[in-house]
């Protein structure tokens, strides 16, 4: 068995273990976010019930992707959790996601885009509930944020972020009343 295949198998096994321990989805009573990039809409969900709808969100200026690379301007699809909050962000308020996930990292490792050391560091960050490093080819610091002092007309008419999901400042303030650390976020 090749070293790459061995590490790939070992890492996928570890990833499945993390999913089982952390849970792949929110329980029926928890609030979670469903972000529909095609409709440019963020849904605040409780179980399978829509609680609130935020329309005209902006995504990455170059669309969406399942295999994001640093500085590509694309919003990564996937299942995340909010890991950190910056209420002093230049974007008004920033909810940081746990991107890259172990799944993103394992795929990138199998495609020779990150090293075994980088893969292991991303896994360890997830195990500890910390923000994964953004210094790999996968990038990082992906989240949900406001516009800050940006031009609201641009936000309403264009996808403008470097990969994040953006709402108006008013929308992000309203959303902040309902979500926090650990909130599940699905970007599709």
Report the location of each language-model feature.
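N-terminal post-signal-peptidase region of extra-cytosolic proteins
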Residues: 28-31, 55-84, 125-129, 169-174
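Solvent-exposed coil/turn segments that connect beta secondary-structure elements
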Residues: 38-40, 47-49, 57-62, 85-88, ...
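Secreted/periplasmic proteins
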Residues: 37-41, 45, 54-69, 74, ...
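Extracytoplasmic
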Residues: 28-30, 37-40, 52-54, 77, ...
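Exported/periplasmic cell-wall-interacting domains
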Residues: 88-188
């Amino acid at each position: 068995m090749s070293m790459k295949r061995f590490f790939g198998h070992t890492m996928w096994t570890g990833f499945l273990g993390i999913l089982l321990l952390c849970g792949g989805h929110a329980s029926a009573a928890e609030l979670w976010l469903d972000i529909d990039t095609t409709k440019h809409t963020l849904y605040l969900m409780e179980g399978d019930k829509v609680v609130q709808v935020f329309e005209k969100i902006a995504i990455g200026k170059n669309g969406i992707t399942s295999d994001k690379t640093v500085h590509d301007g694309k919003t990564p699809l996937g299942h995340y959790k909010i890991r950190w909050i910056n209420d002093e962000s230049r974007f008004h308020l920033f909810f940081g996601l746990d991107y890259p996930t172990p799944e993103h990292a394992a795929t990138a490792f199998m495609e020779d885009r990150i090293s075994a050391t980088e893969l292991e560091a991303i896994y360890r960050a997830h195990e500890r509930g910390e923000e994964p490093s953004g210094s790999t080819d996968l990038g990082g610091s992906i989240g949900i944020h406001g516009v800050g002092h940006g031009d609201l007309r641009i936000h309403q008419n264009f996808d403008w972020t470097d990969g994040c999901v953006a709402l108006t400042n008013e929308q992000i303030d309203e959303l902040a009343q309902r979500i926090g650390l650990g909130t599940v976020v699905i970007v599709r």
